């Protein structure tokens, strides 16, 4: 356009990339809606089978809705190129495995459960240069990346939270830190008690 003529020598490429989509994920949970049986040996001379799982008829696909807004910029005949993107991703019916249940059901855990809702949002910047210095067979170019992601557990069943959090004792043997899952915090956050001083 005529009103952009001033940019011809500076901006060699400019593009915007808005996207939106919804995806489903079974997370390996396919088939859990069926009752399965396995051999349990023999009884009174006859083969015996036993249930090997609980039928999970209410299990849903994990669903992720995401939007992205990005742009590509090239400067000085693409001597410098940049890509910038912001995103917001919400996952509902989050799939988690091996959640403990009362053994009165005949099993101590469920293979999969729909655990809650989690959100990831953030931004990312990539930049690079064309070959701007060349000496003989040696050439130089620069590339860089910087990004930031914010993760938040928005909803989760109290029983599942209890199962995930488990022990609250720091283990000095293998230097493992306490990780805790709490609503309105990042999944697997490292936590500790506030110090009142040394005495």
Predicted regions and their residues:
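Extracellular/periplasmic, surface-exposed regions of secreted and cell-surface proteins
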Residues: 1-185, 190
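Short, intrinsically disordered, charge-balanced linker/junction segments flanking boundaries
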Residues: 193-199
């Amino acid at each position: 356009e005529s009103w952009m003529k001033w940019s011809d020598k500076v901006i060699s490429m400019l593009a915007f990339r808005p996207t939106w989509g919804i995806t489903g994920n079974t997370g390996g949970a396919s088939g859990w809606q069926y009752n399965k049986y396995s051999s349990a040996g023999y009884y009174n001379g006859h083969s015996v089978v036993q249930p090997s799982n609980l039928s999970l008829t209410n299990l849903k696909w994990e669903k992720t809705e995401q939007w992205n807004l990005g742009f590509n910029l090239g400067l000085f005949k693409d001597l410098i190129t940049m890509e910038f993107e912001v995103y917001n991703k919400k996952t509902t019916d989050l799939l988690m495995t091996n959640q403990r249940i009362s053994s009165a059901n005949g099993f101590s855990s469920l293979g999969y459960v729909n655990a809650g809702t989690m959100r990831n949002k953030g931004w990312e910047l990539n930049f690079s240069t064309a070959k701007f210095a060349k000496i003989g067979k040696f050439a130089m170019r620069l590339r860089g990346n910087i990004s930031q992601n914010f993760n938040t557990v928005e909803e989760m069943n109290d029983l599942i939270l209890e199962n995930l959090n488990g022990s609250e004792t720091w283990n000095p043997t293998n230097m493992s830190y306490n990780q805790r899952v709490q609503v309105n915090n990042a999944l697997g956050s490292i936590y500790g008690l506030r110090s009142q001083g040394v005495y």
